[in-house]
Amino acid sequence: DGLIEMDGMKKRTITLADSHRADRIPVVGVVTAGVPILAVENIEGYLPWDGEAGCFALRVRGDSMIGAGILDGDRVVVRSQPTADNGEIVVALLGDSATVKRFRKDGNQIWLLPENPAYQPIDGNHAQIIGKVKAVIRTY
């Protein structure tokens, strides 16, 4: 499936392929990649998304996940789910604050790990997993 279509019978007829095919997902605010900040869920707009249902997007603020390729200003697409497996990148709620980190469980201890040595791991035992990061969207 291509992104453009051409009519071989006509000259200069290039059109977008079925642009209605992709679903849209809401951009619902900001999540930090650094020190958690207050989580306020406001729909700021929509992004096209041709992936699975149950996803939303968040803007990233901070640099704690640069080692995972998630930069300040990126948007992360998140699948809503309350659990995570070791090594997955998640969005977690800590009280009223949301953060994006790598999930790790060691026995009964849950850690939310940054991907930048300038930041410390966060004790995640009282965190609520909001979802798993499925994609990173960067605009230049």
Which role does the model predict for each range below?
Residues 1-71, 97-98, 105-109, 120-122, ...:
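Short, positionally conserved secondary-structure boundary motifs
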Residues 68-140:
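C-terminal regulatory/effector modules of DNA-binding transcriptional regulators
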